């Protein structure tokens, strides 16, 4: 019954103890689980999932586990229930030694997100060890003269258990001379001493055999015994005496071996051998003390034998005995404590619990990269550890617990600037001098598609000569992307503009992998001069990014078009007859060859040359004007002359064409050139012809007067102006004005605005474009005269005698008048207004695209001249162009192609400045009146 009560009492004590331990952890702010030592595998320690408020369903996914290799050998976590279980039995004595408390810190780590939890497990001691004496037989010698009350220290027993399970008492077998006294040291250990209660009498009893028992406080208690043999010695009545009963010294843990720590002194008043004192360690001094310290037997010097380690043991306490040489020998003992002073001899060590090897560059600031713990076994300030990383890195350290840190991102990451980081973590203690440890964490930055492809230029200009071969490489549009992987793979595509009629894909092809632009067909400058398109570079990221570049392609002109003769024009292989009055002098204008070239620039700059003639000395051809004149006076009996005029451009190689003129005196031209005007009656006589001419002259005067009055009235209604008739037979209203704005157009009237210095500033041809039929050759008879037409439609029955067949004037070549899109920018205008003479020299613009515009304007001017429109009265330097080209464009730098426009039957050319330079008035377009041998019919 008594045993049953005791068992219930023990159970209650254990339950109370476990309850106090469990709740003590919560009071201290830390979860602590008590568990008895030597618990079997699978023993329940605590439910960490419940205590850490974790979802048990996600424990497997988050991989809840115990951190640290040492702790993983003893504990494990059940991922199904979240329970902390014993993995291997724990021996408290092997784990914590003789420490009063055995606390094992545990760290738990979860993933997704990465988190750490801390708890403690207290290993509760179990009374599984019995006290044991160093030896089973203890020998003690006591002089018979020892007085009662003298104490003799005994070797104490050792118990591996701690706390209440350690040694709690000593017992001595019953006897009449000795008693047992137990002293408690500062560390809580008990030291037995033998107390002499009665004087000894060696003669009665020389030795005593006693039993010494050590009992622990476990339940049930365990005990250990040793035999104590006491020998009674002969009288030595003075024992050695120490100066003090206990000594305490301090020494640095870094003290070198061989250092003398203390010298003990003991005196014995006896003489002889009884006064010789010998020092030695007491019998119960542990071996670890004997291995560290050496005690000289005669001098009492305590010498250090090996290195000290404050972190392993911070003090040593043992007994030293002094014995004399008497018989029996007498001895005395003292207590010696050696305290170790901590020295900063241990550098901190860093443990990276968990780290991410790769981090995307889009990670937000505050993302956990690694969990770091630091430890320093030193004490005090030597164990205070601080952690740091380089300042220039976009990372920071956050303190979670004591000596626990989290490495997080502190700013944005850019893989293109830095693709990996070697983060050196430095742990330093606060010792003097401080010690530090380095640990490098390697982190790779994964790419995110945050950079669009970029071209080296925002726009490209490509120049390609016409007549190129299909498939030729035009340009290579390379784009770069600082991203990596698929984010840096670039594909190219052609963007078609919506507002353009010409599709760029019909001219070029784009390689989607390399960005190379190839021509799909041959370019023709006369059809396409420029081509603009956009190319898009797009990466393969998610989402994809892109950029565009504008490409301007300019087609360069090649000399692939031969000059075309506009006037005089004959069918291929035929002659173009030209009439020459008899007995003309030198310098007489026979005709003017007008040619154009569809090319541009120097390729369109034509020159004229007399290639073939029966007598080249009779004729001269102006090199650039194309005027065919007589070089010497022509005799009256000159036979017909066949002149071959070659027209050649300035290209490389130059191209040319030719026109053949048949120049003959007027009597020889009538059989060659048929008269288009049919006569309904035979010629009668000179008197009748004179009558017809007189009637015609009167009619023409009336018509001219009426036209003049009508023109004058219109000019007076529109603005104050003066009427001026030009040599070509065209009248215009001239207005002097200092204002720069032009006059509004009016139908059927040529308006010319003059500046204060008389040059023409504004020309406007109103009304419809009427064709002027070329007049017949100059009449040779005295009663013939030249008829001048008004700008209106030709009158019925009007006599016309063209020098070339009218149907062949343009030979199927129709030149449309220039539209309003042909405008010159300020940078393309050759110069200020001024007159241009009809010399053979001239400067061509250097810019090919300026000359392209000028080429079109020249064609338009030549077309107007060929049609005989009123624009022939243009001002100097304007080449007879209409006002739509602006008064500021005078073509000073272009050869005067007005000289290439020739009006048959007239010596006038398209210039009004020659008269000013020569000091003469321009010649009339109707020439001299001469009689003809033929009748003219209205």
UniProtKB/Swiss-Prot annotation:
Residues 714-938 are cytoplasmic. Keywords: Calcium, Cell adhesion, Cell membrane, Disease variant, Glycoprotein, Intellectual disability, Membrane, Repeat, Signal, Transmembrane, Transmembrane helix. Residues 791-847, 908-938 are annotated as: Disordered. It comes from the Eukaryota. Changing residue 483 to E: In NEDGS; uncertain significance. Residues 822-847 have a biased composition (Polar residues). The gene is PCDHGC4. One of its GO terms (molecular function) is calcium ion binding. GO terms for biological process: cell adhesion; homophilic cell adhesion via plasma membrane adhesion molecules; negative regulation of neuron apoptotic process; nervous system development; synapse organization. It comes from Homo sapiens (Human). It is linked to Neurodevelopmental disorder with poor growth and skeletal anomalies: An autosomal recessive disorder characterized by global developmental delay and impaired intellectual development apparent from infancy. Affected individuals present with progressive microcephaly, hypotonia, delayed walking, poor or absent speech, intellectual disability, and variable skeletal anomalies. Variable features include seizures, non-specific dysmorphic facial features, oculomotor apraxia, and non-specific brain imaging abnormalities. It is a single-pass type I membrane protein. Residues 30-133, 134-242, 243-350, 351-455, 456-565, 572-676 form the Cadherin domain. The chain crosses the membrane at residues 693-713. InterPro entries: Cadherin-like_dom, Cadherin-like_sf, Cadherin_CBD, Cadherin_CS, Cadherin_N, Protocadherin/Cadherin-CA. Residues 928-938 have a biased composition (Basic residues). This is Protocadherin gamma-C4.
């Amino acid at each position: 019954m008594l045993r049953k009560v005791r068992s219930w009492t023990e159970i209650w004590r254990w339950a109370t103890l476990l309850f106090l331990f469990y709740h003590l952890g919560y009071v201290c702010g830390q979860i602590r689980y008590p568990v008895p030592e030597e618990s079997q595998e699978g023993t329940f320690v605590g439910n960490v999932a419940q205590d850490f408020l974790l979802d048990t369903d996600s424990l497997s996914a988050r991989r809840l586990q115990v951190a640290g290799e040492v702790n993983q050998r003893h504990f494990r976590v059940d991922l199904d229930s979240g329970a902390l279980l014993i993995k291997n039995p724990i021996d408290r004595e092997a784990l914590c030694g003789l420490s009063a408390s055995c606390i094992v810190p545990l760290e738990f780590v979860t993933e997704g997100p990465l988190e750490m939890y801390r708890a403690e497990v207290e290993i509760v001691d179990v009374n599984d060890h019995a006290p044991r004496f160093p030896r089973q037989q203890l020998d003690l010698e006591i002089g018979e003269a020892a007085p009662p009350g003298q104490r003799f220290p005994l070797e104490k027993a050792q118990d591996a258990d701690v706390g209440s399970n350690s040694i709690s008492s000593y017992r001595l077998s019953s006897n009449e001379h000795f008693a047992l006294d137990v002293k408690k040291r500062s560390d809580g250990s008990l030291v037995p001493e033998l107390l002499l209660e009665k004087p000894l009498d060696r003669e009665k009893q020389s030795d005593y055999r006693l039993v010494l028992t050590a009992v622990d406080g476990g339940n049930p208690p365990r005990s250990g015994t040793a035999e104590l043999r006491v020998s009674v010695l002969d009288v030595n009545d003075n024992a050695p005496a120490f100066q003090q009963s206990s000594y305490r010294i301090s020494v640095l843990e870094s003290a070198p071996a061989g250092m003398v720590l203390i010298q003990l002194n003991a005196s014995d008043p006896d003489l002889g051998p009884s006064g010789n004192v010998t020092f030695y360690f007491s019998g119960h001094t542990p071996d670890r003390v004997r291995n560290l310290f050496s005690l000289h037997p005669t001098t009492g010097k305590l010498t250090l034998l090996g290195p000290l380690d404050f972190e392993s043991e911070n003090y040593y306490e043992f007994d030293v005995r002094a014995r004399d040489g008497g018989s029996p020998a007498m001895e005395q003992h003292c207590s010696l404590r050696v305290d170790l002073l901590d020295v900063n001899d241990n550098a901190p060590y860093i443990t990276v619990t968990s780290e991410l090897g790769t981090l995307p560059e889009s990670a937000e600031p505050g993302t956990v990269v690694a969990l770091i713990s630091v430890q320093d076994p030193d004490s005090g300030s030597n164990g205070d550890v601080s952690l740091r990383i380089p300042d220039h890195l976009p990372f920071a350290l956050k303190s979670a617990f004591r000596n626990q840190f989290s490495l997080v991102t502190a700013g944005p990451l850019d893989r293109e600037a830095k693709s990996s980081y070697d983060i050196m973590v430095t742990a330093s203690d606060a010792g003097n001098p401080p010690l530090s440890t380095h640990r490098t964490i390697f982190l790779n930055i994964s790419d995110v598609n945050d950079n669009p492809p970029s071209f080296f230029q925002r726009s490209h200009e490509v120049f390609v000569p016409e007549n190129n071969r299909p498939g030729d490489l035009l340009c290579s549009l390379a784009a770069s992307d600082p991203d990596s992987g698929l984010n840096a793979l670039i594909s190219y595509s052609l963007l078609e503009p919506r507002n353009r009629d010409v599709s760029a894909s019909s001219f070029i092809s784009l390689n989607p992998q390399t960005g190379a632009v190839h021509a799909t067909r041959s370019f023709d400058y006369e059809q396409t001069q420029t081509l603009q398109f956009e190319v898009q570079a797009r990466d393969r990221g998610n989402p994809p990014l892109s950029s565009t570049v504008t490409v301007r392609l300019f087609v360069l002109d090649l000399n692939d078009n031969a000059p075309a003769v506009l006037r005089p024009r004959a069918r291929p292989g035929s002659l173009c007859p030209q009439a020459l009055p008899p007995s003309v002098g030198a310098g007489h204008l026979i005709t003017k060859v007008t040619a154009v070239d569809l090319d541009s620039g120097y390729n369109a700059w034509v020159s004229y040359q007399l290639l073939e003639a029966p007598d080249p000395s009779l004729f001269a051809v102006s090199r650039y004007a194309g005027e065919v004149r007589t070089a010497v006076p022509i005799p009256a009996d000159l036979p017909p002359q066949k002149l071959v005029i070659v027209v050649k451009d300035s290209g490389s190689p130059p191209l040319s064409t030719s026109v053949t003129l048949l120049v003959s005196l007027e009597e020889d031209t009538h059989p060659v050139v048929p008269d288009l005007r049919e006569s309904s009656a035979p010629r009668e006589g000179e008197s009748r012809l004179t009558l017809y001419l007189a009637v015609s002259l009167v009619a023409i005067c009336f018509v001219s007067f009426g036209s003049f009055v009508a023109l004058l009235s219109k000019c007076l209604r529109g603005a104050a102006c003066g009427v001026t008739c030009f040599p070509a037979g065209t009248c215009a209203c001239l207005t002097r004005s200092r204002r720069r704005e032009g006059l509004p157009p009016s139908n059927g009237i040529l308006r010319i605005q003059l500046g204060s210095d008389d040059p023409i500033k504004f020309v406007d041809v109103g009304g419809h474009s009427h064709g002027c039929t070329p007049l017949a050759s100059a009449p040779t008879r005295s009663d013939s005269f030249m008829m001048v037409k008004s700008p209106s439609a030709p009158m019925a029955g009007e006599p016309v005698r063209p020098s070339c067949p009218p149907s062949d004037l343009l030979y199927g070549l129709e030149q449309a008048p220039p539209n309003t899109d042909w405008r010159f920018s300020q940078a393309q205008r050759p110069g200020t207004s001024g007159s241009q003479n009809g010399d053979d020299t001239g400067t061509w613009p250097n810019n090919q695209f300026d000359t392209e515009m000028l080429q079109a304007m020249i064609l338009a001017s030549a077309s107007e001249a060929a049609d005989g429109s009123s624009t022939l009265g243009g001002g100097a330097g304007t080449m007879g162009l209409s006002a739509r080209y602006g008064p500021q464009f005078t073509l000073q730098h272009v050869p005067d192609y007005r000289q290439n426009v020739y009006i048959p039957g007239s010596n006038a050319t398209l210039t009004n400045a020659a008269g000013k330079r020569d000091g003469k008035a321009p010649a009339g377009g109707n020439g001299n009146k001469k009689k003809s041998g033929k009748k003219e019919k209205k």
